Structures are given as C-alpha cells and as structure tokens.
C-alpha cells in the first residue's frame, strides 16, 4: 500500500486527495520529509523491488517538481546531498562486490573440491586397477602352469578368482568415468560481475538476455554508472573550488610578491634618498668648509690687504706727509721767500718811501728854505707866493700818496700770486 501511495503521489501529487477549497501544503525541497536521494537522481529503493536485493519501500517524498526546484536553486550540489548519495551507492556497490567475491570463492572452492575429489579417487582406482591387473596376470600365469601340469581343478578355481578380479577392475573403471563427467559439468558455472548472480557458461541467449534485462542487473549497472558520474561531477566541483582557491592563492602570492617588490623598491628608494641626503650633507659640509676656508683666506687676505693697505696707507700717508711737509716747506720757503720778497719789497718800498720821504723832506726842507728865503725876500708878495707855495705842496703830497698807493697794490698782488702758487703746489701734491 505504501508503494502504491508513493506511486500515486508521484503521478498526481501529494495533494491529490484535497478538496478544491482546502489549503495545499507547500513543501520545500530541503524539507526532511523529502527523499534527498531522489533529488540527486533516483532512489535506490525503487531499483530492486521484488528481487533478492530488495531494499524495502522508501517512506519519503519523491516529487519531480521538488527535484527541478532543487536543480534550479543556488544551493545545487552545495548542500552535500550528492556526497551522501554517493556514499550510499558505494555502500551498495561494496555489498554487491562482497557478493561477487563470495561467488568467486564458492566457485573456486567447488572446483578445488571437485578436482581434489576426482584426482584422489581416480588415482586410487587407477592404482587398484593396476594391482588387479597385475594379480590377474600372475593368476593367469599360474593357471597356465597348473594346466600344463594337469591340475585342472586348481586352475578352474583360480579362473574364478581371475573373473572376480576383472569384474572389480571394470567397476573401478566405471566409477572413475562417472566422477570425471560430474567434474566437467561443474566447471561450466560463472559469476556475473555486475550483480553477483551465478550464470551457466554457454547457456541459451534468451536466458542470458533475461538476466541482463532484469531489475537486479540493471539496478546495479545504473548504480555503478551513477557512482562514476557522481565522482566525476564532484571531482570537477572540488576542482573548481580548488582551482578558485589555487587562483586566489596565486593571486595572493602575486600580490605578496608585488608588495614585496614594492617594499624593496621603497627600501631602495629610501636608501637612495638617504644616500642622496648624505651626499647632499657631505656637499653642504664641503661647501661650508670651502666657504670657511674662503672666508679664512679672505679674512687673511683682507687682513693682509688691510696690512698692505695700512702699510700702503701708511706709506702713502708718510709720502703724503713728506709731500705735505715738502709742500709746506716749499710753501714755507715760498712764503719765506715771499715774505722775504715782501720784506725786501717792503724794505725796498720803505727805503724808496724813505728815500722819497727824504727826498720829499729834502725837497720840502729846500722848499721851506726857499720859502723862507722867499718869505724873507719877498715879504711883499706873501699872499701870492703863499698861494703858489700851498699849491705846490699839495701836488707833492698827492704824488707821495699815489706812490704809497702803488707800493701797497704791488704788495697785494705779490701776496695773491704767492697764495695761488701755494694752492697749485698743494693740488699737485694731492694728485700725486
């Protein structure tokens, strides 16, 4: 009844008995009441119904729509149903493999027993037959000897014994042939490598076809094919994550290598920068040393220049002083000369003036004498003579004043000329 209900569920659905107004049950493919083996392909319980390998009915839901939903879902072959299905099928194959091995062992054991059982009795029978043959030959020789001697009764008794031995020998020979025929019949059995059933070698083709089309043989053949297919699928599925993992790992390794190269480049750049900074610092120190050396040399040169300039200035000042002293001496000599000249000119002028004065005095004294003479002589003409004498004395005084003025002007010109010569000599000294 359960298998019939499941068949009806597969054909008409689990809600076949519900009324139109009743709510239908929405079962997902991941529900525990759903057969996960059926979702993966087929349920093994459906393969061996009414066979020696019958697994019994499956009480879980077998729904084609649920299997389609599972195949379309994003969790297809990711939940682990396929691995469970593969393990279950491998357990069934392990069971049938054990059955096949037991069948092969049974055939081997029976063949060994048959071969050992046939070889043992046959060998013994052959030995017995050989012994009986030897006895028969010996008895026949004795019978011939007894017959030649005329012992007929003894010969007849021995002939009966020979007949009995021959019958026993024939019985042993017939037994050996029967055992060999039975052993030949047992060797024609074999074991099916798919389902483990015993087959007769050289059996009719119809019986062979019936076996190949049977549920048990087809079920195990399907299980073997499904196991190989699942192994291939799972291998590919495992290779894809492995490949993805490998690609991811390779990508990470490349990134690590790139990071390592970047770190190495940065380290080289930092090292180069440090070296450049060190070189720049060294250059700066060199420049500073050169600058200091230049400043020291410049300072020393300046000091030497100052010394030289001071010495030159001192020399120049000394030469200038000498020149100035010389110019002063010259000026002094010139001034002295001028003063001498002035003094001489003045003395000359004084002498001249004195001489003039003397002359004028003499002249005046003479004039006074004459005037006195005139006064004395010409007392009568005093008025007119006085006028004339006054006019003459005024003209003489004017001439003396003009003479004094000319002498003063000549002295002034001489002083101006001496001053200009002194200024010119000082200019020449400064230019030198």
UniProtKB/Swiss-Prot annotation:
There is a cross-link at residue 424 (Glycyl lysine isopeptide (Lys-Gly) (interchain with G-Cter in SUMO1)). The modification Phosphoserine is found at residues 3, 110, 115, 420, 425, 431. There is a cross-link at residue 424 (Glycyl lysine isopeptide (Lys-Gly) (interchain with G-Cter in SUMO2)). Keywords: Acetylation, Coiled coil, DNA-binding, Isopeptide bond, mRNA processing, mRNA splicing, Nucleus, Phosphoprotein, Ubl conjugation. Widely expressed. Highest levels in heart, brain, pancreas, thymus, ovary, small intestine and peripheral blood leukocytes, as well as cerebellum, putamen and pituitary gland. Lowest levels in lung, liver and kidney. Also expressed in fetal tissues, including brain, heart, kidney, thymus and lung. It comes from the Eukaryota. The modification N6-acetyllysine is found at residue 231. Pfam families: LUC7 (PF03194). The modification N-acetylmethionine is found at residue 1. It is found in: Nucleus speckle. Phosphorylated in vitro by SRPK1, SRPK2 and CLK1. Its main location: nucleus. GO terms for cellular component: nuclear speck; nucleoplasm; nucleus; U1 snRNP; U2-type prespliceosome. Residues 234-287, 302-311, 368-414, 421-432 have a biased composition (Basic and acidic residues). Residues 124-181 form a coiled coil. Belongs to the Luc7 family. May interact with SFRS1 and form homodimers. Interacts with JMJD6. Interacts with RBM25. Interacts with RSRC1 (via Arg/Ser-rich domain). Interacts with RRP1B. Binds cAMP regulatory element DNA sequence. May play a role in RNA splicing. This is Luc7-like protein 3. It comes from Homo sapiens.
């Amino acid at each position: 009844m359960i298998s019939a209900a499941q068949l009806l569920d597969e054909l008409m659905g689990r809600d076949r008995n519900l009324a139109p107004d009743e709510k239908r049950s929405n079962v997902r493919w991941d529900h525990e009441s759903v057969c996960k083996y059926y979702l993966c392909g087929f349920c093994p319980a459906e393969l061996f119904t009414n066979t020696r390998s019958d697994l019994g009915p499956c009480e879980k839901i077998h729904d084609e729509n649920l299997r389609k939903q599972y195949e379309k879902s994003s969790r297809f072959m990711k939940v682990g149903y396929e691995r469970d299905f593969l393990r279950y099928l491998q357990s069934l194959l392990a069971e049938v493999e054990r059955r096949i091995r037991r069948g092969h062992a049974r055939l081997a054991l029976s063949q060994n027993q048959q071969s050992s059982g046939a070889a043992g009795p046959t060998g013994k029978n052959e030995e017995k037959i050989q012994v009986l043959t030897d006895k028969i030959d010996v008895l026949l020789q004795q019978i011939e000897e007894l017959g030649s001697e005329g012992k007929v009764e003894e010969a007849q008794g021995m002939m009966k014994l020979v007949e009995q031995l021959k019958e026993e020998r024939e019985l042993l020979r017939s037994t050996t042939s029967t055992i060999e025929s039975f052993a030949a019949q047992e060797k024609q059995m074999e074991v099916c490598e798919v389902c483990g059933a015993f087959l007769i070698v050289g059996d009719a083709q119809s019986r062979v076809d019936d076996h190949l089309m049977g549920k048990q043989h087809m079920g195990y053949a399907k299980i073997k094919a499904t196991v190989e297919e699942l192994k291939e699928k799972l291998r590919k599925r495992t290779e894809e994550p492995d490949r993805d993992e490998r690609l991811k790992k390779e990508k990470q390794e490349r990134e690590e290598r790139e990071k390592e190269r970047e770190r190495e480049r940065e380290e080289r750049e930092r090292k180069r920068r440090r070296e450049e900074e060190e070189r720049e610092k060294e250059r700066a120190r060199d420049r500073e040393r050169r600058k200091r050396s230049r400043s020291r040399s410049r300072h020393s040169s300046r000091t030497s220049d100052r010394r030289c300039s001071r010495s030159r200035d001192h020399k120049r000042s000394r030469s200038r002083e000498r020149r100035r002293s010389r110019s002063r001496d010259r000026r002094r000599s010139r001034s002295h000369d001028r003063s001498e000249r002035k003094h001489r000119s003045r003395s000359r002028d004084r002498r001249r003036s004195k001489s003039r004065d003397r002359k004028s005095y003499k002249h005046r004294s003479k004039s006074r004498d004459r005037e006195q003479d005139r006064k004395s002589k010409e007392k009568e003409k005093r008025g007119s003579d006085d006028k004339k004498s006054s006019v003459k004395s005024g003209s003489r005084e004017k001439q003396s004043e003009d003479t004094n003025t000319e002498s003063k002007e000549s002295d002034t010109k001489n002083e101006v000329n001496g001053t200009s010569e002194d200024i010119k000599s000082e200019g020449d000294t400064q230019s030198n």
